[in-house]
Amino acid sequence: RPINNTFENLGRETFMMPVKWSEDGFPYMTQGDDLVPVIVRREGVKRDESATFGNFEMNDGFDGQTLGMEWMTLRAPATGLYSLSQTPGYLTLKCDSVSASEKKVPAFICRRLQHHKFECSTRMLFCPQSKAEQAGILLFKDEKHQYFLAVGRDDQGECISLRQIGDGESKM
C-alpha cells in the first residue's frame, strides 16, 4: 500500500486466499473485477487470540527471560547491546557509538509497523553524560529515512530533540 505512489512504510504484506486453477493452468483468487475480501472465513479455522491485526494494543513489561517474537534487532543480533536481566522488568540498552544510519548493528530493539496510523509510547530512564549519548524512539524506514525523538545533552544540559533524517541530511 504505497503512500502517494512513493513510499511503502509497511514492507511486504502477505495475504492468504483460497486459490483455484483455470483450465489452462493459471491460479486465480477472484472472478473478473471482484475485490479480494478483507476477511475470508474458513470452516474449522479459529482465529488466534494473539493475532495483531485491526485495532489492538500491545504492552510489554519486559519481564521474561528473552524478548518476544515480535521484537527484532537491526541487521543482525545485537548480542551484548541489551539485557532483560540487568534490571528485571526493564529492557536495558547499552550506549554504543553506532547509529541506525550506518550499515552496522546499533543498540536498537524494534518491532515492525503494522498500520499506517498508530500510536506508540515508552517509559525511559536515561541520563546522558555527553553530547554523543542519545536514547529515545526511532521511526526507521532505512539508513536515509528516519525520525528520531531523543533525550540527549546540549550546552545547556539535558534536552529533547526530534531529528528528521532524509536523503543523507539531518534536520532538527
Predicted regions mapped to residue ranges:
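Short edge beta-strand segments in beta-sheet-rich domains
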Residues: 11-16
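Short, conserved, GDST-rich strand-edge loop motifs in beta-rich repeat architectures
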Residues: 2-9
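Extracellular glycan-recognition regions
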Residues: 17, 21-172
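Short, loop-centered acidic/histidine patches that primarily coordinate divalent metals
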Residues: 1-2, 165
